[in-house]
C-alpha cells in the first residue's frame, strides 16, 4: 500500500486501498507521525498549536486494507515480517514543544531552559545518530510499529487514539519484526490501517514522541475465525512472538491500573481456553512469571501496556496432562486464590 493512501482515522467508511486474501504478504509504506514535515532542528515549536499549524494532524496511517473472508467476531492476525526504516527520507525526528513536556511537564523546571527543542537524527544502517552538545551518540535502531488497528464497528476513531476493540496508536515496542498482532474484526474485511513507525522508543514514551520515522513495513495477514476458537473472546488486542504470549491493555483515557487489568484479564482467558489452566492457576502463574512493558504513560489517562509470559512456562495445549483440566464451575476457578 503506498504511503500516499493515508488518513488520520481508523474509519470503516473509507474505500479500501487494496483487497487481499488470507495469507497474503505485502508492503505498507508509511510517513512519520509528523507527515515528514519536520526535517530541521531549526523548526522549533513554542506551542503545540504551532506544530499542528504545520502538519495539520498527527499520525497518518496508511490504508485501509480489505481482507477477504474476515467477518465481525473474527480476529485479524498481522505478522510483522520486516521493517525498513527511512525509505522515504533517511532520518528520524523527535521534539518537545514549549508547552507539552510529557511526563516531566510542570515538575522539572530545568527543562524550561532548553525548550522548545527539535532533534533530527540521521539513520545510518542499524544505527541512529543522536546529536548532542557533547557530540553525536550512536544508538542501535529498535524498529517498531506504533499505530496498527482495524476499523471500529461504527463511525471513525482518531489515529492518535486507541481502543480495546480495534487497536490503534498503542505504541508498543514489541510490535516489531517477528511479532504477530491479533486485532478484533468489527466490519467485513476488517479494514486494516498501519503507521507511526519508530526507529527507537524508550519505555513509556515519556516525552510524547519517539524517534519518529518513515518506513516500508512488510507484513503477512491471516484470519483467526471465531468458529475455530470457541469460548475464546479477546477483550483487547493480542501480541505474540516466537517466545512469548501477550495482551495489550489499551483503553484510551483510562489509568494505567485499568489497562493492566484489561491485559492481565485477557491473558488469563488465553491461558484458560488455550492452555488448560483454571483462571486461578493462570492468575497465579502470571503473578510469578509475567512481564509488563509500559508502552505509554505521557499524560493523565494516556496509557497503554503490554503484558507477556514466556511460552517456556506455559502448558503445551497439544499435550494432555493429569490434573490440568478443570471446569469453569470448579470451586477454585474464581477469585484471587
Model-derived regions, located:
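Short, well-ordered loop/turn sites that connect or cap secondary structure elements
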Residues: 20, 67-70, 175
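Intrinsically disordered, low-complexity linker/loop segments enriched in Gly/Pro
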Residues: 82-176
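Short, Lys/Arg- and Gly-enriched loop/turn segments at beta-strand edges
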Residues: 33-44, 83-94, 189-199, 295-298
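A generic structural signal for residues embedded in beta-strands
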Residues: 28, 75-78, 183
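N-terminal, Lys/Arg-enriched amphipathic/low-complexity engagement segments
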Residues: 1-53
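Short, structured beta-strand/loop micro-motifs enriched in basic residues and often containing a Trp
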Residues: 2-11, 54-62, 158-166
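Conserved mixed alpha/beta catalytic, RNA-binding, or beta-rich assembly cores of soluble enzyme
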Residues: 141-257
